[in-house]
Amino acid sequence: MAVKIRLTRMGSKKKPYYRINVADSRSPRDGRFIETVGTYNPLVAENQVTLKEDRVLAWLENGAQPSDTVRNILSKEGVLKKFHDSKYSK
């Protein structure tokens, strides 16, 4: 089972916000997911992001692949740097 960290669209028409979910890659975008690890609101001036960093790092260590957009969000939040440092600091 290939696991992805990706965005699930929520909200109403013209006013989206997104949940950052861990899901099987074969499930639909807004379908079944394993765990919610954060939220992303692109309509706020600063693109409000909340993350459960410990859970995101745990999923990355277990081999979950982030989507391109989630990879950019994690990079801006500094999570990928922490993951890289923990992986290669041995």
Curated annotation (Swiss-Prot):
GO MF assignments: structural constituent of ribosome
Keywords carried by this UniProt record: Ribonucleoprotein, Ribosomal protein
In its UniProt record, which GO terms are filed under biological process?
translation
Got a GO cellular component term for this one?
Answer: cytoplasm
Q: Which family does it belong to?
A: Belongs to the bacterial ribosomal protein bS16 family.
What is the protein name for this chain? Small ribosomal subunit protein bS16
The organism named in the record is Streptococcus gordonii (strain Challis / ATCC 35105 / BCRC 15272 / CH1 / DL1 / V288)
- The encoding gene is rpsP
